[in-house]
Amino acid sequence: MNAAFIANMERILWLYALPLDPKFPVVCFDERPCFLIGDTIAPIPMEIGKVAKENYAYEKNGSCALLAAIEPLTGKRVAQVHGQRTKKEYTIFMQELAKQYPEATKIRLVQDNLNTHNTSSFYENLSADEAFELAQRFEFFYTPRSASWLNMIEIEFSALSKHCLNRRIPTQELLEKEILTIVKSDRRSGTR
């Protein structure tokens, strides 16, 4: 732990301590890989008093990327599943995130230092005017290196892992459907 680590950590903790302000919402963003795994033999369904049984053999169907954000003080969530994780997908997600906060002056975005997590991604994928306009919607707060645990979206990823990412899901379409169902149902019920 050095001075830069402590400085970034304290900046994030200061941000989390701020009261709710719709003009300056605090939103935590990250992405994670998801592996698409199918069954080679159909699982044996559950019976009363018995657990479902699945064969140890499985089929690899590639991977995809889950991009997600959460506003910790309200529980508002946004999620997208993409075939890959590049500057293009980051830009698409940030455009959607900005649309979710039309009244915000600036979205205070907590994220890690990944090479795609900066405004240059916008300029590589949008016109200069659109990129500038999108960049003005955000104020970036970077977690210290090796400190993703400071980003509250990690808690959401843990919850998603327990709900649906802890089992075999064979296609990107099915994964997206399941994740968006959970995100939308949590939003309606106020579950966190």
Regions of interest found by a model, annotated:
Residues 120-131:
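Short, aromatic/basic amphipathic alpha-helical patches
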Residues 1-59:
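Charge-mixed, compositionally biased segments that are often intrinsically disordered regulatory tracts
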Residues 23-24, 104-106:
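Short coil/turn segments at beta-strand junctions that form active-site/ligand-binding loops
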